[in-house]
Amino acid sequence: MDTSDFNFKFLGQSVLRYQVPLDVYNTINHIYETKYPELKPANKQLVGKIEKEHSLFYDGENSNKMTKHNHLPQDILQWFHQKFIHYLEWNKVTEYNTHLNSVWINTMFEHEYNPVHVHQGMLFTGLSSVMILKLPQSFGVEYSSPDQPQNGRLQILGSSSGQFANVDYQPDIKERDF
C-alpha cells in the first residue's frame, strides 16, 4: 500500500518522562527541608486537598493568594527551562514564549489527594509537570482491587478521544521521575 501522501496530526498531548539529575534532586530536597519554615503555603492557589503545599518559586502576578518569591538557584530554574524547551521542540512546536510561573511541593499523607484538574498558567496552553521527590515505603491497604493498586498513583488525563486514543497515563512512579 502506497502511503506517500499520508500526513499525520496528533490530536492529543504528549507526555515525556525524564530522570532528574541527582544534583537537581538533592538541591530541591535540601531547600525544602532547610527552608521549610520560611516557605509560603501554596494551598490558597492550589486545588489539592493537601495540608502541606509550599511554594519554592512564584513569578506570576502578585495577589492575596501569592506574591513573587524565589528559593531556587539559577541552575535549577535553568534545568526546568531546558526540559520545557526540549518538550516543545520534541513536539515540533516552533512558535512559543516560555515563562516559568511556579514551583511548589506537595507533601501528601493518608487521605489527602489531588482531584482531577487542569493547569493552564497565563495562557490556555500552559505546560505542567510533576517531579517525584520522595515516596513512602507503602501506600497502605488497597481495599477495592489489590491486583490493580491505585493508592498513591499519578494519573495524567488526556483530552483526545477516539477508538484507539490513549485517554490516560498511569506511570509507575519512582523518585527522581519528572
Model-derived regions: residue spans:
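Residues at beta-strand starts and edge strands
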Residues: 12-14, 99-101, 125-127
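A short glycine-rich, His/Asp/Glu-containing loop-to-beta-strand
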Residues: 97-107
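Catalytic core of non-heme Fe(II) oxygenases with the double-stranded beta-helix
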Residues: 106-178
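Non-heme Fe(II)/2-oxoglutarate
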Residues: 1-96, 111-115
